[in-house]
Structures are given as structure tokens and as C-alpha cells.
């Protein structure tokens, strides 16, 4: 019998060409920007209407914040490109605001207005890997050539559907994409059957990757707007931050997280419910 792990590797290898970036970044059809940024936001069933509204409003406010605007326009080209995507289970990803160039405060306000105007709804399961793979495809033929390409993933639980999150992360990083994380630890110490108390460590070990990648945990919804603002300043700044200043959760080597914990929890509870 063909081993499952080998089969999965072969399938990913065949899928790889679909994720390769455009060959010529300098083509005249592509607009040069300092950063191409995918904001990938969790809307799985654990998110209620109020939480989803907080997320949308938090990003809209941050994108028009003076410090964030300064970061956007501080690079070599003085402009960035951003898209906003909501995600849940594998195959459940929805682009709320397509790629838009932001080169002025008016551009940023227009993006924020679109973000607040779009409908929001939640979906089943949590596929961080699906979000990363979909976000990776969004860079292809998007009309922009960024000096840096970043996927920002926010979520309140571990991956429990789709390919293993480490494989999706490694594929994106191998294509020159940086993945940053915003783990939402906003339950006040109460955890559901599919959640884990060490989501901050999980994001560091299993989700983020690439040069100067970072994870910025959010411990309460009251912290969310400021966390998003700070994260965007770091991601959009035209200069690299010293690694010592990046807000990464540091963990000891021996505390390496089980990156399949979400899948194991899902199997455990599905089996118990039979």
C-alpha cells in the first residue's frame, strides 16, 4: 500500500506549480509596492457576530491610524497593496476586499469603508492551512510586485482541517512569503472542545515563518484594536525591525508544540459523539 505520508507529499508536489509566484516581478503590468499584504481573518463558528464585528472595525480603524499610515508610506515606493480575506474550514475562504493599492490616506479610508460595508458570516471548522494556501494563491497575477510579501493570519484555535499547517507554512515560506500571526486568546480562561490554552506557542511553532516573522497574542477583545494597529505598523514599515524588538512569544526548545493537536482534538470529540 502506498504510504499516506508519501501520497500527501506527492499531491502537494503536483499542486506546487499553482502556488509559484509570477516569474518576472519587473514586468510593466505589475505595479511596484513596498509590501503586498494578505489579512487572513478567522470567522469559524467559535466567532460570534459581536467578535466578527470587533475584528472588522479593529482593522478598519487601524488601517486609517496615523502611525499605520506613516508606516505604509515610509518605504521606497511610498505605497502598499492589501487584500482582506475571511476564512474558516478547508475550502471556506472569502475575499471581502480584493487587492487595492494604498498610496494616500484617502486610499486607506476607501479600503476601510469597503471592509465595513461587506457582509460577514461564520463557517464551520478551522483550517489555518487552507487559509495560508489560499492566501498564497492570491499573490499570483494580482497586478503588484512587492518588495515584501506577507500573510497575516489571525485565529482563535489550532488547525483542525485540511493539510497539516506546517506543510502549508513551509510551502508559502519556500516561495518567499512571510507569515505573521495574531493568536486570539480571548476566552477569559474558558476553553471549548476544539481550543487549546497555549495557542500563542502553537502559532510560534506551527504557523509563523519567514525572515523576521512574528506572533502577537491578543488576551482580550479590549486589546484587539491596539494589537492590530501595532501589528500593521510592524508589517508595513519600510524598514526591517530588529529581531529583538519583534513581539514574538519565545518558547524553550523542549516545549515544541504538537502541530496536529487540532486534528487530534477533532477526531477525539467526533469519536466520542458517535
Predicted regions and their residues:
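Short beta-strand-loop
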Residues: 75-114, 191-204
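C-terminal "exit" segments of structured domains
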Residues: 216-274
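Second-shell loop/turn segments in exported
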Residues: 40-50, 82, 98, 114-125, ...
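Von Willebrand factor
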Residues: 31-98, 106-154, 181-191, 198, ...
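VWA/integrin I-like adhesion module and closely mimicked acidic/polar interface patches used
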Residues: 158-205
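Sec/Tat signal peptide C-region and signal peptidase I cleavage site
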Residues: 20-28
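Bacterial N-terminal signal peptides
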Residues: 9-21
Amino acid at each position: 500500500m502506498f504510504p499516506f505520508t508519501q501520497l500527501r507529499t506527492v499531491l502537494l508536489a503536483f499542486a506546487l506549480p499553482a502556488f509559484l509566484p509570477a516569474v518576472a516581478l519587473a514586468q510593466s503590468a505589475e505595479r511596484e509596492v513596498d509590501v503586498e499584504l494578505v489579512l487572513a481573518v478567522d470567522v469559524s463558528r467559535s466567532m460570534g457576530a459581536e467578535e466578527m464585528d470587533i475584528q472588522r472595525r479593529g482593522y478598519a480603524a487601524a488601517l486609517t491610524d496615523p502611525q499605520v499610515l506613516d508606516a505604509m508610506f515610509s518605504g521606497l515606493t511610498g505605497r502598499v497593496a492589501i487584500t482582506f480575506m475571511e476564512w474558516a474550514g478547508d475550502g471556506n475562504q472569502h475575499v471581502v476586499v480584493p487587492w487595492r493599492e494604498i498610496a494616500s490616506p484617502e486610499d486607506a479610508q476607501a479600503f476601510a469603508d469597503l471592509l465595513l460595508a461587506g457582509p460577514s458570516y461564520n463557517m464551520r471548522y478551522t483550517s489555518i492551512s487552507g487559509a495560508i494556501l489560499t492566501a498564497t494563491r492570491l499573490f499570483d497575477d494580482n497586478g503588484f510586485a512587492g518588495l515584501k510579501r506577507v500573510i497575516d493570519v489571525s485565529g482563535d484555535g489550532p488547525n483542525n482541517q485540511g493539510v497539516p499547517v506546517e506543510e502549508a507554512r513551509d510551502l508559502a515560506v519556500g516561495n518567499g512569503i512571510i507569515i505573521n500571526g495574531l493568536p486570539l486568546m480571548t476566552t477569559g480562561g474558558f476553553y471549548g472542545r476544539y481550543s487549546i490554552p497555549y495557542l500563542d506557542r502553537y502559532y510560534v511553532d506551527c504557523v509563523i515563518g519567514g525572515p523576521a516573522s512574528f506572533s502577537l497574542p491578543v488576551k482580550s477583545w479590549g486589546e484587539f484594536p491596539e494589537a492590530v494597529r501595532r501589528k500593521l505598523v510592524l508589517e508595513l514599515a519600510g524598514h526591517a525591525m530588529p529581531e529583538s524588538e519583534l513581539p514574538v512569544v519565545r518558547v524553550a526548545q523542549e516545549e515544541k508544540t504538537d502541530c496536529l493537536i487540532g486534528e487530534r482534538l477533532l477526531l477525539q470529540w467526533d469519536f466520542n459523539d458517535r
